């Protein structure tokens, strides 16, 4: 697997992961290499965009840091539940029945 990241913008010249994700997906073609996206995955809507552009999963390290510091384990659990609800909501609105049926035609960019 690979993780596509720009270290949360700390590299001023780096391209945002969602901008290059379709290209990476095309280059990898039908390979078995999984793609995970990092940086800016703070909501289920962000995860939806990444999945639609070809990611197999997302990393939410920074997105759960604040809830962890404020509420501990419960804060993280609540944040993850909210993100899952947002993702499911977007999938329902766009007719994506499961995570294997995403494609970039659901986005306009």
Enumerate the language-model features and the residues they cover.
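Short hydrophobic/aromatic-enriched beta-strand-loop microsegments
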Residues: 1-6, 57-61
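Active-site entrance/lid segments in N-terminal catalytic domains of soluble metabolic enzymes
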Residues: 5-11, 23, 31
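Alpha/beta catalytic cores of nucleotide-metabolism and tRNA/nucleoside-modifying enzymes
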Residues: 19-38, 42-109
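Short, small-residue-enriched loops and turns at beta-alpha junctions
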Residues: 8-14, 43, 66
């Amino acid at each position: 697997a690979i993780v596509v990241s720009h270290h949360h913008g700390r590299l001023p010249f780096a391209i945002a992961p969602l901008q290059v994700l379709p290209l990476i997906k095309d280059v990898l073609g039908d390979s078995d290499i999984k793609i995970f996206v990092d940086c800016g995955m703070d909501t289920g809507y962000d995860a939806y965009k990444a999945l639609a552009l070809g990611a197999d999963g997302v990393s939410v390290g920074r997105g759960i840091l604040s809830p962890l510091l404020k509420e501990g384990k419960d804060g993280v659990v609540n944040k993850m539940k909210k993100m899952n609800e947002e993702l499911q909501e977007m999938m329902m609105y766009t007719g994506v029945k499961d995570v294997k049926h995403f494609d970039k035609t659901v986005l306009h960019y």
